[in-house]
């Protein structure tokens, strides 16, 4: 039976189909030319499960990062022989057969450092090099040095790195920016995508796609040469995110791609595996067991996909904000992801033009225009007056306001009148004395109230400024910087997240204790310091009073967190 003629939107989506077909081969080629390292839960099978379930270590990531001292198959064979013998000591067996990750030395900054001096001094402390790794190490080698976030995070993370790189550039470390771009390009060439982090157990997923923005950042220093140099890797990453689109029918989803009923193409977060995460093994098993009405594999996939989003975890993905087992990440089309995909398409167009391929540049521009229309049609809640995620189950835009709603402004994909409404919604519902709330829901999860995260502060600040909403943008920067400074004055460190209901308090919630370091906070703090202080009078600490050159506002009273989305 002949299919009905496609509607006009479907035709628009099909115009650049050759791009998807051509680049689908690129990601396949990358995967076929290298042997993908196996994660520790596969390498060690029942031994890995038993060690994690025995809770030998306070942090499940410890054993996931442990390095086998010999062939894992031999270790597993020895374990099977010994495990039922009387007096068998699992902890002793692990200590004999594995090299556990070393605790990093606690960094003690010199006395009397300003905030800027402290951050500048941290860059070498947070720099790692893994050109060579042990044969069975879960750590993936990278050709150049890189900057890690800090704390328990001993490896490089994808989306964290962009905000870290903003700070490196602000400090004049363009060599480190170039090294990190080269490392991510290496991962794309080796694995077909940029994994969540450079660990074997992160290979089944990616994270918010900032690589094109990293290349664009490098181009500020190196010019169009950077765009031309990394165009092939940007194309491969785009192919990874759009993998399977050529076979999709209207109303279907495949991996990271969603095709809506009118042919609009959007993206979602996805993990290729549906098992517990090795770095959070026991926690994931407990979450799955707590909801016997859902298949465990479905819950595992949604947990992993939430990790791919960077927002692990948040009421944003959950039907019941108080029950993690109700999350359904894969049935939600995220507004921030699709904003980043729009930006990727725009940068690919620019890079193609720089490389002299105007035809390809036009095709990417067509894709970006189609996606922008999709964002405006499906990811805007007209009743509420803000951008939000789209629900594939209810076939409606969701009602919850989150800090992700500022991403269309950040990438210049928003309509001007909607940007004005976003400024009002942000100031009314998300802005707090210590910065921008992630959501207005208190769930106990770390990507919810009262936590504020540096990358979201910067996205909001830049996004609002893009549309002339400077007052709210400066409010966010000033409030967050005050929070960072107060915490630094008391504890002499920058942390992963902050409690924005007040100032001077690190954030809480989630699966692990608060981490210090901290890469993306360092980067955003430097950018904001240079934003709020006049160029003729740069500041090394946050001023005691708000600079007169910027608009001043009354201090915000703390808003009560809402119990439900």
Swiss-Prot record:
It is found in: Periplasm. Its EC number is 3.2.1.28. GO terms for biological process: cellular hyperosmotic response; trehalose catabolic process. InterPro entries: 6-hairpin_glycosidase_sf (IPR008928), 6hp_glycosidase-like_sf (IPR012341), Glyco_hydro_37 (IPR001661), Glyco_hydro_37_CS (IPR018232), Trehalase_periplasmic (IPR023720). One of its GO terms (cellular component) is periplasmic space. It is an enzyme of class 3 (hydrolase). It holds the Pfam family Trehalase. Residues 1-30 form the signal peptide. Substrate binds at residues 152, 159-160, 196, 205-207, 277-279, 310, 511. The active site is at residues 312, 496. Residues 539-565 are annotated as: Disordered. It comes from the Bacteria. NCBIfam families: PRK13270.1, PRK13271.1. Provides the cells with the ability to utilize trehalose at high osmolarity by splitting it into glucose molecules that can subsequently be taken up by the phosphotransferase-mediated uptake system. Monomer. This is Periplasmic trehalase. It comes from Escherichia coli O6:K15:H31 (strain 536 / UPEC). The gene is treA.
């Amino acid at each position: 039976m002949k299919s009905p003629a496609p509607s006009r939107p479907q035709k628009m989506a099909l115009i650049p189909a050759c791009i998807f077909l051509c680049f689908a081969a690129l990601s396949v080629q990358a995967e076929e030319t290298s042997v993908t390292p196996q994660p520790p839960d596969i390498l060690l099978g029942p031994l890995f499960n038993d060690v994690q379930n025995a809770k030998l270590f306070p942090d499940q990531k410890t054993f996931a990062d442990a390095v086998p001292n010999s062939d894992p198959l031999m270790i597993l064979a020895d374990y099977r022989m010994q495990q039922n013998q009387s007096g068998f000591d699992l902890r002793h067996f692990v200590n004999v057969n594995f090299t556990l990750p070393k605790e990093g030395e606690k960094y003690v900054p010199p006395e009397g450092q300003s905030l800027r001096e402290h951050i500048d001094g941290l860059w070498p402390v947070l720099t790692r090099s893994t050109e060579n790794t042990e044969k069975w190490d879960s750590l993936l080698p990278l050709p150049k040095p890189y900057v890690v976030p800090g704390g328990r995070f001993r490896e490089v993370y994808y989306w964290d790195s962009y905000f870290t790189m903003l700070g490196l550039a602000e400090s004049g470390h363009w060599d480190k920016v170039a090294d990190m771009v080269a490392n991510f390009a290496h991962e794309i060439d080796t694995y077909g995508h940029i994994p969540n982090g450079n660990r074997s157990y992160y290979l089944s997923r990616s994270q918010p796609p900032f690589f094109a923005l990293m290349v664009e950042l490098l181009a500020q220093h190196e010019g169009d040469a950077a765009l031309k140099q990394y165009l092939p890797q940007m194309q491969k990453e785009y192919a990874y995110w759009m993998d399977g689109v050529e076979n999709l029918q209207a109303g279907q989803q495949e991996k990271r791609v969603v095709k809506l009923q009118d042919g609009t193409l959007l993206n979602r977060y996805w993990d290729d595996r549906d098992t517990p995460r090795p770095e959070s093994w026991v926690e994931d098993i407990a979450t799955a067991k707590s909801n016997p009405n859902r298949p465990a594999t479905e819950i595992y996939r949604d947990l992993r996909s939430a990790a791919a989003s960077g927002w692990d975890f948040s009421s944003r993905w959950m039907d019941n904000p108080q029950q993690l087992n109700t999350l359904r990440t894969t049935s939600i089309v995220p507004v921030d992801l699709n904003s980043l995909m729009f930006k990727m398409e725009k940068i690919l167009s620019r890079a193609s033009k720089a490389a002299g391929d105007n035809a390809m540049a036009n095709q990417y521009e067509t894709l970006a225009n189609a996606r922008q229309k999709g964002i405006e049609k499906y990811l805007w809640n007209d009743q509420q007056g803000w951008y939000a995620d789209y629900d594939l189950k209810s076939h409606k835009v969701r009602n919850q306001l989150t800090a992700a709603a500022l991403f269309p402004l950040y990438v210049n994909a928003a309509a001007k009148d909607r940007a004005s409404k976003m400024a009002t919604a942000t100031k009314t519902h998300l802005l707090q004395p210590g910065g921008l709330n992630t959501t207005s829901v208190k769930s106990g999860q770390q990507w919810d109230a009262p936590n504020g995260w540096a990358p979201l502060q910067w996205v909001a600040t830049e996004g609002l400024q893009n549309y002339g909403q400077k007052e709210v943008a400066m409010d966010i920067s000033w409030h967050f910087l005050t929070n960072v400074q107060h915490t630094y004055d008391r504890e002499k460190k920058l942390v992963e997240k902050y409690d924005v209901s007040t100032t001077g308090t690190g954030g809480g919630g989630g699966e692990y204790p608060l981490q210090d370091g901290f890469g993306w906070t360092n980067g955003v703090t430097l950018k904001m310091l240079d934003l709020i202080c006049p160029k003729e009078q740069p500041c090394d600490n946050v001023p005691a009073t708000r600079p007169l050159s910027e608009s001043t506002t009354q201090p915000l009273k703390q808003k009560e967190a809402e119990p439900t989305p």
